[in-house]
């Protein structure tokens, strides 16, 4: 790491308000259809598909009958899958197009989440949540890499700010929207 030379000087314009910077990010995103699709995709995915993260304690207790250490291991299975999914994008899937990986990971994520959402078997829940985590981070890594490779240095920070709002900012909003639905019809149908 000590031999790496990087230019950390600020890029873009300085002295702009945060709203102006957000506006510049939106303008840059709209200028490239791929960038716009990536931002919309991660936003919709985060809003609608990551509700299960907030519901894992409920699923563990009510559907699987586990708590304590078993719940910790369940969440660790998700995290381990996510870590392997991210690493796999730079290793064994590095030659596969990010577009194919994004599309494929959404289907794998949906199937694994469906299994996780309906199962009452811990033997099925652990591998399902592991695969869910892996597919989730294959998608996030593929989309993030695509985004960063397509935007220029002078607007990358502004566009990545939009990415963070879509990726991390909409997950709790999705949880708030899903909460009353889960109370009304149950966790499995919502997932």
What is each of the regions a protein language model found here?
Residues 40-47:
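Hydrophobic alpha-helical transmembrane segments of multi-pass membrane transport/permease proteins
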Residues 6-40:
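Juxtamembrane intracellular "pre-TM" segments in multi-pass secondary transporters
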């Amino acid at each position: 790491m000590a031999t790496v030379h990087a230019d950390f000087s600020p890029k873009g314009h300085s002295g702009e308000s945060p709203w102006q910077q957000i506006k510049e990010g939106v303008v840059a995103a709209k200028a490239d259809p791929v960038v716009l699709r990536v931002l919309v995709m991660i936003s919709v995915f985060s809003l609608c598909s990551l509700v299960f993260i907030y519901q894992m304690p409920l699923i563990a207790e009510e559907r699987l009958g586990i708590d304590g250490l078993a719940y910790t291991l369940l969440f660790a299975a998700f995290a381990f899958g996510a870590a392997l999914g991210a690493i796999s994008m730079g290793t064994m899937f590095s030659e596969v197009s990010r577009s194919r990986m994004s599309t494929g990971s959404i289907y794998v994520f949906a199937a694994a989440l469906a299994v996780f959402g309906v199962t009452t078997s811990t033997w099925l829940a652990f591998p399902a949540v592991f695969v869910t985590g892996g597919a989730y981070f294959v998608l996030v890594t593929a989309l993030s890499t695509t985004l960063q490779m397509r935007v220029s240095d002078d607007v990358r920070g502004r566009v990545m700010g939009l990415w963070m709002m879509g990726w991390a900012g909409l997950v709790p909003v999705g949880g708030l929207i899903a909460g009353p639905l889960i109370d009304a019809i149950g966790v499995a149908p919502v997932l």
